[in-house]
Swiss-Prot record:
Organismal lineage: Bacteria, Pseudomonadati, Spirochaetota, Spirochaetia, Spirochaetales
Organism from which the protein derives: Borrelia duttonii (strain Ly)
Swiss-Prot/TrEMBL keywords: Aspartyl protease, Cell inner membrane, Cell membrane, Hydrolase, Membrane, Protease, Transmembrane, Transmembrane helix
Keyword Cytoplasm: no
Role summary: This protein specifically catalyzes the removal of signal peptides from prolipoproteins.
The name this protein goes by in its record: Lipoprotein signal peptidase
Superkingdom classification of source: Bacteria
Pfam families, per database record: Peptidase_A8
GO cellular component: plasma membrane
PANTHER family per the UniProt record, alphabetical: LIPOPROTEIN SIGNAL PEPTIDASE (PTHR33695:SF1)
PROSITE patterns named among the record's database cross-references: SPASE_II
Swiss-Prot/TrEMBL GO biological process terms: proteolysis
Gene label: lspA
Record-stated family: Belongs to the peptidase A8 family.
Catalytic activity: Release of signal peptides from bacterial membrane prolipoproteins. Hydrolyzes -Xaa-Yaa-Zaa-|-(S,diacylglyceryl)Cys-, in which Xaa is hydrophobic (preferably Leu), and Yaa (Ala or Ser) and Zaa (Gly or Ala) have small, neutral side chains
Keyword set includes Protease: yes
Amino acid sequence: MNINRNRLVSNLIFISILVFFDQWSKYLVVTYVRLGTEYLSFFGDLFKIIHVRNTGVLFSLGSNIDSSLKNLFFLIIPIIILVFVFSFSLKENNKVSRFALILILSGGIGNIIDRLFRPLGVVDFLDVKFFGIFGLQRWPTFNFADSYVVVGMIVFIIYDLFTKDKSTNL
C-alpha cells in the first residue's frame, strides 16, 4: 500500500489533538467533579456538567452484560474497526470524507482509552436538556469523544448523500 507520508503525519497530528482534548476534559471532570454530582449549570438547566460513568455503549446499552462479552464487543471489535477506519482515512482523497473519518477515529480512540484505563467506565459529563423530544427530557450524558463520532458520522452521511455522482440515472 502506497501511503502518502504527509497525509499520515497530518492525520496522526489531528487525531492526537482531538484525543488529547477529550482525555484532558475527562481528566478535569474526574479530578474536580465528584462522581454522580453536578458541577455547573448554564442557562438554567439547559446545559450541565455532571460526572457519570458509562460501562455500556451509546445510551448505556450493554451495561449489564458479562464482562468477558464487554471486552469482545466494546474493546476488541471496536479496535479492529478503528484499524480499518484509519487505513481507509489514509487512502481517502476527499478532504471532507477524511475529516469525518478522523473525527470518528478520534472519538473511538478516546472512549477505548477510557475502557482500558478507567475501571468505573467511560467518563461522561455533558448533559443537555432535550425538551421532551423523542420522549426525553434530557439527552443521555455524553463526552467529547461521543460528539466526535456523531459529528463525523453526520458529516460523512450528509456529504455522501449530496455528492453522489449525479450522472448515474436509475
